[in-house]
């Protein structure tokens, strides 16, 4: 209760947040994925209806990796790269990518 009284996000307290039916690790140093951001994935599906298209997806400012990883889950033959300048967010994105999508996602600590 003390952490909530200090207005710490519930996702930080739990250490996780669901996004696009996937369970992402989150905490201080990374933005919590928001449900309204899922509209980006919906729009990608609308624009590219062939979910087996061999896409290469880039995510600039990857944060937790939620957008890139969700897109890769939907596009089964796609690969992607996420760039993140924050070392803390990079760590979260790297762990989430390794656990949820494997070698199809590469996360780089870099300014873009």
Predicted segments, located by residue:
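Conserved SAM/SAH cofactor-binding pocket of Class I
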Residues: 39-112
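Conserved AdoMet
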Residues: 1-47
